[in-house]
């Protein structure tokens, strides 16, 4: 069959309301999945037979995404398993928008899900987190300076020893 006879062709418009509704539904499902955070709180539970899970929007703490990982900067209890599950679900949902055969719906849904990942990242950032980060950076800077000073002192001692040996 040639391209003109094919019943399935990619379109580049938002003109089909059915496709738009499918894309919107997939986006809402994906955004909800990306924004929800299920975690088990630390400490003893009141009922040992019942699993005590909490659901919140966004992770508590501040995290930064990288292409192949996550850097937990301040008190974040996001697990690697949770991230992998979210990535797989997001990928599958974006690919399911291709059933609409509408490139605009596919692109808009994919972009929306990517933005929901970013929203998940910054959902629960606290002003205190910035102060903690600044304090941690300051401590690291001081540690580096101390190490450099120790290295310089060792070099000076070595040069002094060499001078004494030559004399």
From Swiss-Prot:
Disulfide bonds: none annotated. Residues 136-159 have a biased composition (Basic and acidic residues). Coiled coil: none annotated. It is found in: Membrane. Residues 136-167 are annotated as: Disordered. GO terms for cellular component: endoplasmic reticulum; membrane. It is a multi-pass membrane protein. The chain crosses the membrane at residues 21-41, 87-107. Keywords: Membrane, Transmembrane, Transmembrane helix. This is Uncharacterized protein C688.12c. It comes from Schizosaccharomyces pombe (strain 972 / ATCC 24843) (Fission yeast).
